[in-house]
Structures are given as C-alpha cells and as structure tokens.
Amino acid sequence: AIEEDMKKNNGLITMEDLANFRAEVKNPLSVKYRDFEVFGPTAPCGSWTTLETLNILENFDTKSMGHNSPEYLHMFVEAARHAFADRYHYLGDPDFVDVPLSGLLSKEYAKDVSQQINKNYAELENSYEGDPWNHYSDIEIHDPWKYESRNPNAKLKNGDYDQNSDCTTHFSTADKNGNLVSCTQTAVGHFGSKVVSKGLGILWNNGMVW
C-alpha cells in the first residue's frame, strides 16, 4: 500500500527503501535528578533537552520556591531556554555528525550553565531578534565539548532551509477520568504534505529534516 501510494503521487520512497530499512535498538540516555533516575531515547531524538534542563534545575533549591511560584517558573523557563539553545545548535544524528552528548548531560556542565542564569530577569531572549531556532543554529552560547573526553570530528553547520517554515504540530487531550495524551508530530510543513494514505491513515511528511 505504501509503494502504491508513492507511485500514484510521485513520492520518493521505493520498495527497496522499505526493504533496506532496519530499526536500531540503542541504549537510552539517563540522568540522576535528585531522587529519581530519568530515561529518554538517545539522539537524534531530542529527549536530552529535557534531561539537560533537569540537570540545570538541580543546581537550584526549587522546593523552597514553592510549586509554580513566579520564582520557580522563572528558573524553569530559563533552564529550558539554555537547554533549547543547545538543542538548536547540537541536535543531530550521531551516525552522521558528532554530538557531544556526554558533555551536554554532565553535571559539571549543568552547573556551569546554571551560573549563567539571572534569578531576577530573563536574559537570553533579549540578546537577538527573530526565531531562537534560527539564531542558535548558527551560534553556540555554551561549550559542552569542554566536558567531553574527546574532540569533535565535525561540527554542525547550518544548511539551507526556509527560515519561515513551521514543522511541528502538537495537541494534548484529556478525558473525564484524568487520562492524558500528549502528541507531537513533526511532519515538516503544517500537517506535512496534507496527504493521508488511503486505508492506512498515515500522514505523509514533506521533507527529511532529521
């Protein structure tokens, strides 16, 4: 059915592509956050952004700030901003580009980054104009390589892409019993190609970013 869809709609995926694809089973990433051990899939998935955020937050006494207090929310947002600045610059497939995962997830690195956070006001968003993913893809504001035991083979370079493209659709839903579902789909353009495979219900994307 997939091959038929591709042929009918001038798609790029062939039966040979499907036959040659192999799923890779890899060890998950993990960090210790206070009394918890938190796991996430390794790169090119972006879970290390969350793990880095937790590592940064661990350097602050968030419990004393109070749940969802202005002080707590400020520290969380600032930690996430720093982690996402790294994500926009370093996220990639380790099979094709060097990603300093050990450095990004080291406790020493997180402590270094935490010392750059101002407790009184936001700083990162005031330093540039435009979208953060465009800005930080070109500029590294931290150096996780200092916390790696190796040197980079090749650093990520910003490629050609549509500066105004939107590539991720997200929705959350809940029922009366408190069951929650959070879904994020990256299909490049808004809803990808806007074509759904007849009978399969697959929404085809319109690009191969990662």
Model feature map: region roles:
Residues H190-N205, V209:
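A short, polar/charged loop-to-alpha-helix boundary motif
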Residues S30-K32, E37-G40, T49, S172-T173, ...:
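Structural recognition of the beta-strand scaffold that forms the well-ordered cores
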